[in-house]
């Protein structure tokens, strides 16, 4: 989990409170309970302050990120670049989809760049290189999402002709949603092996998405994936989102996805 952005839910603090006091004699009075009451009250008070500080820190981090994201957004607008933020769980097929996508966009003459977020390594970036697009890996290490500052650092290196920037965020359906990168839109991916209930379990992502890509449709039948339930759950959370069904393996739905990207570029 992220150790710096505050998106980790737990507080890793060890409080050692020796409650068993050996006074050498037994008190037949109620003051021991009074002591416990005061002790508990003090600790409740401490935890309240700790929670307030934690929330304040989280908000400060988000506010700082939002300011940089707005600068990124202005940078994109000034150069006519459409930036899209792809968010999903690990293994949903983001990189496989981008492989097919870059091939199609290169054939169509669309100048494209890709920024790939992963904790470590450059495996995904290596898969995407040589497909007619500028590709750069961003290693986030112990973090669980890309930040606007990390994106800003990479922008000067983008080719001047770039019209579309595809950002493959870290595999996580929670934390990346809160961190605006300056993108024009968030794109959520839901693969058939993940099940139909993910929009209900992770509503923030699907509510924020301009489009939902239902991926790995070639596996739907063998997995017993209930397509109608999945679509109903997506619509329940976000009635306005575009929903595209596709398979990177068979190419099903790929043309509609490329058409969607071209429309976003021209908006």
Which residue stretches match the model-derived regions?
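Canonical P-loop GTPase G-domain recognition
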Residues: 220-267
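Nucleotide-state-sensitive switch-loop elements of NTP-binding domains
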Residues: 51-74, 78-87, 92, 96-184, ...
């Amino acid at each position: 989990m992220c150790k710096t952005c505050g998106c980790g839910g737990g507080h890793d603090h060890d409080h050692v409170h020796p409650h068993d006091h050996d006074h050498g004699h037994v008190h037949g009075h109620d003051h021991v309970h009074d002591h416990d009451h005061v002790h508990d009250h003090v600790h409740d008070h401490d935890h309240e302050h700790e929670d307030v500080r934690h929330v304040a820190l989280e908000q400060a981090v988000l506010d700082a990120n939002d300011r940089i994201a707005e600068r990124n957004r202005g940078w994109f607008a000034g150069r006519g670049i459409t930036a899209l933020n792809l968010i999903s769980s690990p293994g949903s097929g983001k990189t496989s989809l981008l492989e097919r996508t870059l091939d199609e966009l290169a054939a169509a003459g669309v100048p494209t760049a890709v920024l790939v977020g992963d904790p470590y390594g450059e495996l995904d970036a290596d898969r995407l290189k040589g497909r007619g697009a500028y590709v750069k890996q961003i290693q986030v290490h112990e973090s669980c999402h890309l930040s606007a500052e990390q994106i800003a650092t990479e922008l000067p290196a983008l080719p001047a002709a770039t019209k579309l920037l595809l950002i493959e965020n870290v595999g996580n359906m929670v934390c990346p949603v809160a961190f605006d990168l300056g993108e024009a839109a968030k794109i959520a991916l839901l693969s058939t092996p993940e099940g139909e209930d993910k929009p209900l379990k992770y509503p923030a992502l699907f509510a924020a998405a301009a489009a939902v890509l239902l991926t790995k449709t070639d596996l739907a039948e063998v997995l017993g994936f209930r397509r109608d339930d999945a679509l109903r759950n997506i619509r329940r959370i976000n009635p306005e989102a575009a929903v595209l069904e596709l398979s990177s393996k068979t190419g099903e739905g790929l043309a509609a996805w490329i058409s969607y990207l071209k429309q976003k570029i021209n908006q």
